[in-house]
């Protein structure tokens, strides 16, 4: 992937939850957004008030959980991703 994230931004590929096996079809606006994803790219981090870099704690390949309405959806190379701040991520699988 040729996409460099800036600052403390994280590019996430949403992992679909298997709750859509129901015969009842819901409109897109009523469906629950995924809250689990795989980290595809990370920025270098953010700077504190002294100008020191605070490095990211996440790395490419990490599986994370994030707030349901966090980030912005983007499309790159015909694939949909979510861009969010590292602080919007609430947990990482270990």
UniProtKB/Swiss-Prot annotation:
GO cellular component: cytoplasm
Matches recorded under InterPro entries: Chaperonin_GroES, Chaperonin_GroES_sf, GroES-like_sf
SUPFAM superfamilies: GroES-like
Molecular-function GO term, any one: metal ion binding
Keywords, ordered alphabetically: Chaperone, Cytoplasm
Location(s) in or outside the cell: Cytoplasm
Keyword Cytoplasm: yes
CDD domains: cpn10 (cd00320)
GO BP term, example: chaperone cofactor-dependent protein refolding
Summary of subunit composition and partner proteins: Heptamer of 7 subunits arranged in a ring. Interacts with the chaperonin GroEL.
Known function: Together with the chaperonin GroEL, plays an essential role in assisting protein folding. The GroEL-GroES system forms a nano-cage that allows encapsulation of the non-native substrate proteins and provides a physical environment optimized to promote and accelerate protein folding. GroES binds to the apical surface of the GroEL ring, thereby capping the opening of the GroEL channel.
Family: Belongs to the GroES chaperonin family.
Protein name per its UniProtKB record: Co-chaperonin GroES
């Amino acid at each position: 992937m040729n996409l460099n994230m800036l600052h403390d931004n994280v590019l996430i590929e949403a992992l679909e939850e298997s709750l859509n096996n129901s015969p009842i079809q819901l409109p897109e606006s009523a469906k629950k957004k995924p809250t689990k994803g795989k980290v595809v790219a990370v920025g270098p981090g953010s700077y504190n008030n002294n100008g020191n870099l605070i490095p990211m704690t996440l790395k490419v390949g990490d599986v994370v959980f994030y707030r349901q309405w966090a980030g912005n959806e983007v499309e790159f190379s015909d694939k949909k991703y979510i861009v969010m701040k590292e602080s919007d991520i609430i947990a990482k699988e270990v």
